Each structure stands twice: as structure tokens, then as C-alpha cells.
Curated annotation (Swiss-Prot):
Disulfide bonds: none annotated. PANTHER family: GMP SYNTHASE [GLUTAMINE-HYDROLYZING], GMP SYNTHASE-RELATED. ATP binds at residues 226-232. Pfam families: GATase (PF00117), GMP_synt_C (PF00958), NAD_synthase (PF02540). The lineage of its organism: Bacteria, Pseudomonadati, Pseudomonadota, Gammaproteobacteria, Thiotrichales. It comes from Francisella tularensis subsp. tularensis (strain WY96-3418). This is GMP synthase [glutamine-hydrolyzing].
């Protein structure tokens, strides 16, 4: 079998918010790549055997920082592409000069390609729309580099080494705003580095199954199945690899979407014939959450109880040696903090390092190398339903953070019904995949309404729908008024505990996507 990691690109991270985007663009071309901090050991870089190296952008200023690329990068003889800060430090380390720009440049710009012969601009038009994001600029390229593209505000918009396969761009080819950014990255990765496109779903499935079989042997494996994308794909790949050696534990918290527990059992236990143990823990969660109003406290209680129940059930499975988890590559990067990424750590992730200390199980993470979009494609390749893989994100605590304040059984049932109507109508009107996330929120306040001739004094449901690329920022979805009116009418008429429906028009920032 072909080694899908054989031809690979090493990405050194200088702290850019776009570093993961670079990796995703490379992988979309069918080439494996990994992200490591810029100051990783020289021996590691040497032994990594990359076909090429990409230096990411970053927030530092080259002329007042000691953050630079390791010299080994330029001694290996492999092609190098510096992006933004990566270009600046590469040029400076070769005798060039970088200074603060008179005017920072953030946004779209037109560059003129001056030389497209056998370089990153091969087979491209001379005028290109790109995305700039920089405060410094290269003012002198030095004796080793030549300018191969320029713009009005950045006379040195791209460079190439005169004798070695080193290239730099002042803009960001990895963003969708750079019109032909994919072509630039492909020219570097495939044409200049000579990488074979081995990284595809068929090869990944074959490779993963082989690795799982070798690692696990005849041992038993336990997986906490939530019905979310990651754990669902882990269940599917493990089932193909080891069959009935896998036991899934599905803890039904009672805080899932309407009928979600039954759907999980239908797909995995009935359709795929996977061994799934369903634990009905609804009452335990409601009891533990009684009287609790603080969002963070609710999250902690839900998280701890979930782990406790999982541990109880896992202990009943004899001779289990492995605990499988749905850790994906972005989790690994995000949670590694300063040991892995120079960007600020936003949060710790529940999937990484989550092995209970008292459990003497080895950790199995089949998706650890994959980004979310790759996980979804893998799931399709394994036969999982499209609607399961491309559902909107759902928080770990479930409806526990979509019911404001205290959680009661009545509130959960009311929200489940209202949320299901909203989702159903989004699908019916072909709007579901036009928005990034959509859901209902239960507000524990009552409002007067009139249904027929009867006065009704019941609860309020807020509808939330947003459009986002990365969920770091989001805009509220401008859904048609007729559609919102239809959803509102259905909820008020069909859910007796609701007398009023409102629509949230807050972006992120200043708001967050979830209400709690």
C-alpha cells in the first residue's frame, strides 16, 4: 500500500490566524501536511523529510523581534514558500531589509506579476486580485532575491531566490479573497515541490483501517458515541476495521434535539449493526441540574456527570484495552497551546487529554490527523448519511445552554418541539445549508398572547440563525420575513407552552453565537 504521508509539506507557524487555512488548502490539493511551531528543533525539521516548507504569516514585526525561521530551513535544499511575515523573515535572513510601512494594508489589492517563468505564478494572468494583511514591508530584497510581483502599496509583493527554490508573497494565497490563491499554492506544492497527490479519502480509509488493525489487534475498544460528526465517523471507521470488537456507549442526557437518541440508535445499532449500549440518564441530569442557573456551572455539572456515567458503563465491559475518541487535527492544534501554536489559546478542548486518570485504557484517535471538512468526507466514504455529517454544530452540553437559567423537564420538551419546527422548515425551504447554524433558545419569561378567543400567558422562544466561515465571527442570517412568520405561527400554534417568538439579530461580535 502507498504511504499517504510519503510526500508531505511542513508548515512552520509564526502565529497567523490563517495558518490552519494554509494546511487545509494544501490538503485539498491531495497532499499531506502538518503544522509545527516555528522554533521547533532543527533535528526535527531535518528528520521530517518534507518535500517543501511553508513559513506562515504572523503578528510580529521582523525588525523588532527575534522570531525568525530556523537556518536549517534554508540549508536542506527543499523549496520554501514564505507568506507575509514568512516572506519578510526569509528575505531579512538573506540580507534584505524590512521596515514599517507608511500605511498598513488590510484588504483586497491588485498585484502585477513581473515574472511568471517556472515559479509560483506559472500559467497565471499578469494582474491578480489578492488579500493583503500587513503593517511592514520589504524595502530591499538584497542580492539573493528578485521581485516577481508588485502592487501600489507593496512594491515588493512577491519574491523569488535567484538560485534556489525559495519564494515569498506579501499577501495571503490561502484565503478565498485571493482570487487564484489555490493556483499559487498548487504551483508551489505540486509543480515546484513535486508532491504526488496521495492524500484522498479512499487512501485515508485504507490507511486508517490498516493502522487500527495493527494497533488494536484482537483487543476490545470502547467509544463514547454522541451522535455528533466526529464520534459518528470514529464509530464507522472502527466498525469497518475491527467489527464487534467495538462497543459504543451512548449516554442519553435528555438534553438532545427532538428524537435524536432514537435516530442515533437507528443509524448505528440497527442500520450499521454496531454494538451500542444506550444509557437513559435523563432523570440523573435533571436532578443534578435542579436549581442551577449559572451557565458555567451547568456546563461543568453536565460534563462531569457525563464522564461519571460513561466511566460506570465502561467499567462493566470486560477486557477492554482501548478508549476511542473523536479528536480531530484542529483540536490538537488548538489545545496544544504554546507548545504547538504561537497564536493565543482560545479554549481547551474536551476531546484532547480527556482520559480519566483512573481508567487504565490506551487512547485511540483515528481522526487525529484530519480537519473537520476531511472528517465529513471520510464519513461519506464510509456510508454515513449526508444530513448527519452536515448538520449544524451542536454544543457539548446540548440544550442545557439553550435554556436560559434553570433546566426543567417542561422547558426541555418545549424547546425540543420549537427547535424541531424551525429545523424542519429550514430544510423544507432549502435554507438549512444556507446558514451555518440555526436553533431555538428557551427564555424562562412569560408573555401575554391570544390564541383564538383565549388569552394565553406562556413562554418565549428566540430563534437564532447565523452565517459564518470559521465561527470566530458571524453575522445574523437575513432569513425571509415570510419564512420567519411561518415558523413563528407554527411554533405558537403547535407548542402550547409558547405564546411569543422573537428573532435574534445580533452578530458576533458583539454577541456570541450561543446565548449561554
Amino acid at each position: 500500500m502507498t504511504d499517504i504521508h510519503n510526500h508531505k509539506i511542513l508548515i512552520l507557524d509564526f502565529g497567523s490566524q490563517y495558518t490552519q487555512l494554509i494546511a487545509r488548502r494544501v490538503r485539498e490539493l491531495g497532499v499531506f501536511c502538518e503544522i509545527f511551531p516555528h522554533d521547533v528543533a532543527a533535528d526535527f525539521i531535518k528528520n521530517y523529510q518534507a518535500k517543501g516548507i511553508i513559513l506562515s504569516g504572523g503578528p510580529e514585526s521582523v525588525y523588532d523581534s527575534d522570531v525568525k525561521a530556523p537556518e536549517i530551513v534554508f540549508e536542506l535544499g527543499v523549496p520554501v514558500l514564505g507568506i507575509c511575515y514568512g516572506m519578510q523573515t526569509m528575505v531579512m535572513q538573506h540580507g534584505g531589509e524590512v521596515k514599517g510601512a507608511d500605511q498598513s494594508e488590510f484588504g483586497k489589492a491588485i498585484i502585477n506579476i513581473l515574472n511568471s517563468t517556472n515559479n509560483i505564478f506559472s500559467n497565471m494572468e499578469h494582474e491578480q486580485l489578492v488579500w493583503m494583511s500587513h503593517s511592514d514591508k520589504v524595502t530591499q530584497t538584497g542580492e539573493h532575491f528578485e521581485i516577481i510581483a508588485s502592487s501600489t502599496n507593496a512594491p515588493v509583493a512577491a519574491v523569488a531566490h535567484k538560485n534556489k527554490p525559495f519564494f515569498g508573497v506579501q499577501f495571503h494565497p490561502e484565503t478565498t479573497h485571493t482570487e487564484n490563491g489555490k493556483q499559487i499554492i498548487e504551483n508551489f506544492v505540486v509543480n515546484i515541490c513535486g508532491c504526488d497527490t496521495l492524500w484522498n479519502i479512499e487512501n485515508i480509509i485504507e490507511n486508517d483501517i490498516k493502522e487500527i488493525k495493527q494497533k488494536v489487534g484482537t483487543d476490545k475498544v470502547i467509544l463514547g458515541l454522541s451522535g455528533g460528526v466526529d464520534s459518528s465517523v470514529v464509530a464507522a471507521i472502527l466498525h469497518q476495521a475491527i467489527g464487534d470488537q467495538l462497543t459504543c456507549i451512548f449516554v442519553d442526557t435528555g438534553l438532545l434535539r427532538l428524537n435524536e437518541g432514537d435516530q442515533v440508535m437507528q443509524v448505528f445499532a440497527e442500520h450499521m449493526d454496531i454494538n451500542v449500549i444506550r444509557i437513559n440518564a435523563k432523570n440523573r441530569f435533571l436532578d443534578a441540574l435542579r436549581g442551577i442557573c449559572d451557565p458555567e456551572q451547568k456546563r461543568k455539572i453536565i460534563g462531569k456527570l457525563f464522564v461519571d456515567i460513561f466511566d460506570e458503563e465502561a467499567a462493566k465491559i470486560e477486557n477492554a484495552k482501548w478508549l476511542a475518541q473523536g479528536t480531530i487535527y484542529s483540536d490538537v492544534i488548538e489545545s496544544a497551546g504554546n507548545n504547538q501554536s504561537k497564536a493565543h489559546v482560545i479554549k481547551s478542548h474536551h476531546n484532547v487529554g480527556g482520559l480519566p486518570k483512573e481508567m487504565k485504557l490506551k487512547l485511540l484517535e483515528p481522526l487525529r490527523e484530519l480537519f473537520k471538512d476531511e472528517v465529513r468526507k471520510l464519513g461519506l466514504g464510509l456510508g454515513l448519511p449526508y444530513n448527519m455529517l452536515y448538520r449544524h454544530p451542536f454544543p457539548g452540553p446540548g440544550l442545557g445552554v439553550r435554556i436560559l437559567g434553570e433546566i426543567k423537564k417542561e422547558y426541555v420538551e418545549t424547546l425540543q418541539k420549537a427547535d424541531a419546527i424551525f429545523t424542519e422548515e429550514l430544510y423544507k425551504h432549502n435554507l438549512y445549508h444556507d446558514v451555518s447554524q440555526a436553533f431555538g433558545v428557551f427564555l424562562p419569561v412569560k408573555s401575554v398572547g391570544v390564541v383564538g378567543d383565549q388569552r394565553r400567558y406562556e413562554y418565549v422562544i428566540a430563534l437564532r440563525a447565523v452565517v459564518s466561515i470559521d465561527f470566530m465571527t458571524a453575522t445574523w442570517a437575513n432569513l425571509p420575513y415570510d419564512f420567519l412568520s411561518l415558523v413563528s405561527n407554527r411554533i405558537v400554534n403547535e407548542v402550547k407552552q409558547v405564546s411569543r417568538v422573537v428573532y435574534d439579530v445580533t452578530g458576533k461580535p458583539p454577541g456570541t453565537i450561543e446565548w449561554e
